[in-house]
Structures are given as C-alpha cells and as structure tokens.
Amino acid sequence: MEEFQGYLELDRYQQHDFLYPLIFREYIYALAHDHGLNRSILLDNVGYDTKYSLLIIKRLISRMYQQNHLIISANDSNQNKFFGYNKNLYSQMMSEGFAVIVEIPFSLRLVSSLEATEIVKSYNLRSIHSIFPFLEDKFPHLNYVSDVLIPYPIHLEILVQTLRYWVKDPSSLHLLRLLLHEYYNWNSLITTKKVIFSKSNPRLFLLLYNSHVCEYESILLFLRNQSSHLRLTSSGIFFERIHFYEKKKYPVEEVFVNDFPAAILWFFKDPFMHYVRYQGKSILSSKDTPLLMNKWKYYLVNLWQCHSYVWSQPGRIYINQLSKHSLDFLGYFSSMRPNLSVVRSQMLENSFLMDNAMKKLDTLVPIIPLIGSLAKVKFCNALGHPISKSTWADSSDFDIIDRFVHICRNLSHYYSGSSRKKSLYRIKYILRLSCVKTLARKHKSTVRTFLKRLGYKLLDEFFTEEEQILSLIFPRASYTLKKFYRGRIWYLDIFCINDLVNHE
C-alpha cells in the first residue's frame, strides 16, 4: 500500500472519512485479487508527479493491468456469466478490492495510534500466548467467570450500518450492499463459526465481522474505563487487538444514560472485571458476588440486543465459580488450583508454622481432543496407539521425517505453557513412533529391525531447538534442568492456530 500513497494522497481523504475515488475503478479489484502480480513495475520511475489526478491513476493502473490479463478456466464455463466474466469470480474480485481499500484508513490509524502510545514492539501483542500471562496475573484475584460466544448480527444490513461509523461515503455503502447480495451464501456465513474463520473466507467479510465485534466490545470498553482497578496499560492493550483504535465513546455513554436510570448505573460504578477474546469466543471474569454477576448478564444482553441489534440469549451465558470451573480456551484447559506453602517463623524462643494458600492458574494439555485429532489424520487409532501414515509411505525418507518433525515441534512450541508436561510427552511419543512405523512400512521392515539399522539418533530430530540448546549447555540432566523443563514458557511469535497437517 505504500506504493499508492504518493498518488492517492490518503491523508486528505482520511480527514474526511471518504474512500478515495479508486473505489469505483474496476481495475483495482482485479489487481487486488491477483496475488501473483509483478510488483516491480511500481518501483520503476514512470515520471509521474505527485499531483493528484484521476487520469494519472487510471493510466498507472492501465499499465499494470496490461501485464496481468484475466484468464477464466474452462471449468467455470457452466457458471453464470456477467458481461463475459464469471459472476462469482467477478463478485469475489470486487469484494477483495473493496476490503483492501477500506483497510487502508484503518492501517493508517493503527500506525498513528502505536506512535502516540509509544508501543515499539506491537507485534508481540498479537501473539496468542500473550493472553496467558495476562490471565496468570489477573485470574487468581477473581471469583467468577463466564464463557460468552460473540453474538451474530440478525441481518447483514447491521454490518453495513456498523461500518458507517468510519466510512462516510454513501456510494461506498451502496456498493457494499451490492457485494453482500452477490454472495448468496453469506447468510449461512453469519451463523457458522467454522466458516467465518476459514482460510477461504472472503477478506471483506472478516473486515465486517471485526467491525461488528468492535461495536459489541465497545460496551465492555466503557465499563472498563469506569473501573479504578483497571488503569494498567497491559489490560488496555488487549482491547486494541482488533485494530480499531479510534472508536468514539459517546454513543455507548449516551445509551447508558438514556436506557438506564442512575440507580442501575450504581452496579457498574466499580465493576473490577476482565475480558479476553479470541475469534468468536470470549471470557468475562469478575470479583463481584453472584447476584451482581447475574445483573451484569441481563443488562449486557439487553444492551447488545437494543443497541447493537444482535441476538443473545441470557440462558446460554453461564456464570461459574472460577475455583470449580475449567476453561476450554485457545486449546488449553485452564483452571485455578490452590498452591499450599508452609512458612516456619521463629520469634525469640517461640516458633510457629503458617500455612499460605495461594491460587495459581493451571494450564493443561487437552489430551483426549488431541488424540482424537491425531486419530482423525491417521497418526494413531482411537485409543492413542501409534500407527503408520500410509499416505506418506511413497515420499522420501527426508520428507517423511521432516513432516513429522514439523508437526511435533509445532505442538511442542504451542503447548510449552502447559503446567504438566506428561500429556505433551505422550503426544510426542505417538508422533515419533508413527514416524518410525511409516518408515518401516516403506522399507518393508519391522520397527525393531529398522531402528537397529538406522540407530536411535533418528529420534533426536524430534527435540525442539530449546531442548537441543539446553542439552549442549547441560550435558548431564541436573535437577535445575529438569525443573526448567517442567516450567511454563510463553512465546510471543504465535499468531494463529494451524491444522495438524496443513502442509500436506
């Protein structure tokens, strides 16, 4: 996008919240859809000045388009045509281009917001693992937790109305409605969680969904700002993970004042709550009593239904005691367990013992769902016994080992924050033995014979980089090293949860 800034003067249009005139140029959508475009032509000195001109932009795009012809395969010949083009492909190109254009002002606001708050390493805040240190720090002081699924809008028009807060161009909104109607299956996308976050989902719909979530979370942001206990920068950052930084607060405050009397606002005077979200699932936790938590639930549901026009049922939001409830969140089973410690104190001739009970967040590997996932892709059976991967037997030995090592290291990397490593070691054992059985099947040999011939050094490939470095530093496993292996490690370079065999 930096290549276009000199020609489009984005700052001038950002001030007026208008999309620049390229929104209605057909060429930009074809270029946005084609990921194989040769970008080197943008680096050439074409001799254009920086003065804004539609003619200059059109000539520039025309020159780019001449090297990138649209080819429609013969397989699409039986589908509906639109002015000589495939209708579905044409609509998809339009949506991709529209999403790219709308994202530019948000990206500029993101950069300016990071510079204003002096956030240097903002990419660390995008990591999934950055949520767990926050939970470790806050959850031991809380009492109740509630799992909340993000409610979906009751109609696609709600998504358009939400985007209207940032896009003040009526023509662009009409074009957006046209694109929504072109996708005949988008109504099913609203109610299907797996399809929303699939890799094949249009980029435009993800943008609209994020704007909808921003509107939904603005109520919680208002409550957070009313609390004197949540003035830390760390908790505020997590509300900014959705990349909509300049959401105005007065619509939410106005709703509170108009829809609720002053007596009800007393319940929100000092809520002391925490909120985290990933994709369509969120966690709301607080230190209040069960009575206040239930009042929160009904008030928030009414606000979401009346203000954001989303359908949410109070009966599907369960409030659980944190000490007796296990959270299934981001692939971990998280729960609070007491950590007992005995302190011996002596004063003059008298000595006594003091028992300290501290709460600690316990993160466990979900062993049964993981074994089910491994069994689904034929690494083991339903009981967890390793089997050979028959579909990989035709590959080379190097490719087979590399695939297994890649999956094993990814799982070790992601579940390095587990409190108990026994379940993780079992998953590693399944993958190692499945790899050996696959190689033995390829060479028509038994596992024992194959290991004797190749040696047990094959299994060393499955060690992670951290384990290899520690084994070089500490040749003999000491007590300190074993204790370090049992400790939790959170990485700040994990941005998404991939499938087990997404590279297959």
Swiss-Prot record:
Domain of life of the source: Eukaryota
Keywords: Chloroplast, mRNA processing, Plastid, RNA-binding, tRNA processing
Record carries keyword Chloroplast: yes
InterPro entries recorded: Domain_X, Maturase_MatK, Maturase_MatK_N
A GO molecular function held by the record: RNA binding
GO cellular component, one term: chloroplast
Residues in the signal sequence: none
Compartments, as annotated in UniProt: Plastid, Chloroplast
Pfam families listed in its UniProt record: Intron_maturas2, MatK_N
BP GO annotations: mRNA processing; RNA splicing; tRNA processing
Subcellular location, principal: plastid
HAMAP family reported for this sequence: MatK
Function: Usually encoded in the trnK tRNA gene intron. Probably assists in splicing its own and other chloroplast group II introns.
Family of the protein in this entry: Belongs to the intron maturase 2 family. MatK subfamily.
PANTHER family tied to this protein: MATURASE K
This protein's name: Maturase K
Lineage, uppermost ranks: Eukaryota, Viridiplantae, Streptophyta, Embryophyta, Tracheophyta
